[in-house]
Regions:
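Glycine-rich FAD pyrophosphate-binding loop
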Residues: 22-41
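A short, glycine/Asx- and small/polar-enriched loop/turn
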Residues: 88, 113-121, 163-170, 178
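Gly/Ala-rich phosphate-binding loop of Rossmann-like dinucleotide-binding domains
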Residues: 18, 22, 145
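Extreme N-terminal leader/targeting segments of oxidoreductases
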Residues: 1-5, 22-24
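Helical element adjacent to the flavin cofactor pocket in flavoenzyme catalytic cores
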Residues: 126-182, 186
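Glycine-rich Rossmann-fold phosphate-binding loop(s) that bind the pyrophosphate
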Residues: 9-11, 15, 32
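Dinucleotide-binding Rossmann-like beta1-alpha1 core, especially the glycine-rich loop
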Residues: 45-115, 121-123
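Short hydrophobic core segments
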Residues: 5-8, 30, 178-188
Length: 188
């Protein structure tokens, strides 16, 4: 076997998995493009709002918060507005409470986003705790961590075939053949 773990996809999911799995054994990341995080992971305007989303997402966000805060420069202040119409008051009130937003006036909100239409927007919440995520810094940090533990990244490795082979996997790619005990699909 070439590695314990073979990860297909070199975006944030694949590179962060490589960082963690490299603590447990040998890792190879296969990325189809010329560089890691070439697609959405490298271009996203990421928001860290740990109370937003489905319960599983909120749980993951809350569990990740201390780690994100330990990385200098990964998080920076942003703020987030939640806007609502009169007919959506019940859902708005629920979201305001669950996500711990502060209620602000429409006039205050227009001071932040002047194009808000006060004829349409009747309720506003503000979350000063919402932050930007420097995704490039985060991905590069995970990549350094994985590389520091011996993980290898292979770019220009478009996967062309996958086969279960004995107790592991064989992956064919434009960069050659790779084998591993475990296969992780982190491709976008």
């Amino acid at each position: 076997m070439d590695a314990d773990f073979l990860i297909i996809g070199g975006g944030i999911a694949g590179v962060s998995a490589a960082a963690r799995m490299s603590e447990l054994g040998g890792v190879i990341v296969l990325e189809a493009e010329d560089a890691l995080a070439h697609h959405a992971s490298g271009r996203s305007a990421a928001l860290f709002e740990p109370r937003y989303g489905a319960p599983a997402v909120v749980g993951l966000s809350m569990a990740s918060e201390a780690y994100f805060r330990s990385l200098p420069g990964v998080l920076s202040p942003r703020g987030l507005l939640l806007v609502g119409k009169a007919e959506g008051a019940e859902a708005f009130e629920h979201d305001l409470e669950v996500m711990a937003f502060d209620r602000i006036s429409v006039e205050e909100a227009r001071g932040i986003v002047p194009i808000l239409n006060p004829e349409t927007v009747t309720m506003v919440g503000y979350a000063g705790h919402a932050e930007d995520v420097d995704t490039d810094l985060l991905v590069q940090g995970f990549a350094r961590e994985a590389k520091g533990r011996g993980a290898k990244s292979v770019t220009r490795a478009r996967v062309t075939g996958i086969a279960k082979e004995g107790a592991g996997w064989r992956v064919s790619s434009s960069a050659g053949e790779f084998t591993a005990r475990m296969l992780v699909n982190a491709a976008g």
